[in-house]
Amino acid sequence: MSFIAIIPARYASTRLPGKPLADIAGKPMVVHVMERALESGASQVIVATDHPEVVTAVEAAGGEVCLTRADHQSGTERLAEVIERYGFADDQIIVNVQGDEPLVPPEIIRQVAENLAASSAGMATLAVPIESSEEAFNPNAVKVVMDAQGYALYFSRAAIPWERERFAQSKETIGDCFLRHIGIYAYRAGFVRRYVNWAPSQLEQIELLEQLRVLWYGEKIHVAVAKAVPAVGVDTQEDLDRVRAIMLNK
């Protein structure tokens, strides 16, 4: 099975400016992500960025890069520009690998692509079990609930499903029904072309979760438990410091 990995890498991060170029163990962060994607067995790995300095860094590392417009509102829009510029066929499987996940396990990049290939869903993603009440009630940890066939019913920043009897007594413990969504996606190129033409939905604007647009328009999202749990992504300086420490200890 063939798939292409595209890594959106926006330069102007609000909390960590120049994030794709942040040095981790002697390499820019985006290069670490690119190397993980290459290890996944992707037939092609493309970094999609809005900044010439990122282009220079990726090319210096021997990678493939596409300089996109700077006005995209999401990584999916940036990915869609790459799909159009390369002219990928509608049935080509694309994996959207977040540019701020330098420790992403290569096996889950391949896993989400294989899951999509075996499904009729327009999109596939992954999740991991939540084991603490702190994480279940953390709005930055996105929860997902699925149906019997493994398709997403809903994504939320709230604690879903709500354990009525348990939580009526205490919120200190949780059951084994909670899943945290991982922000890695696989789609067919034709699906992305349709997605970017849909108007944003009310639910995604309330929750600030872009994937809810897919459910709003009646499309399916396949969800599976990830074969490996990703380490911390990089949103803040504290995250970057943690990742640097992990890489130094490897």
UniProtKB/Swiss-Prot annotation:
This is 3-deoxy-manno-octulosonate cytidylyltransferase. It catalyses: 3-deoxy-alpha-D-manno-oct-2-ulosonate + CTP = CMP-3-deoxy-beta-D-manno-octulosonate + diphosphate. NCBIfam families: kdsB, PRK05450.1-3, PRK05450.1-5, PRK13368.1. It is an enzyme of class 2 (transferase). Activates KDO (a required 8-carbon sugar) for incorporation into bacterial lipopolysaccharide in Gram-negative bacteria. Keywords: Cytoplasm, Lipopolysaccharide biosynthesis, Nucleotidyltransferase, Transferase. It is found in: Cytoplasm. It comes from Yersinia enterocolitica serotype O:8 / biotype 1B (strain NCTC 13174 / 8081). The keyword Lipoprotein does not apply.
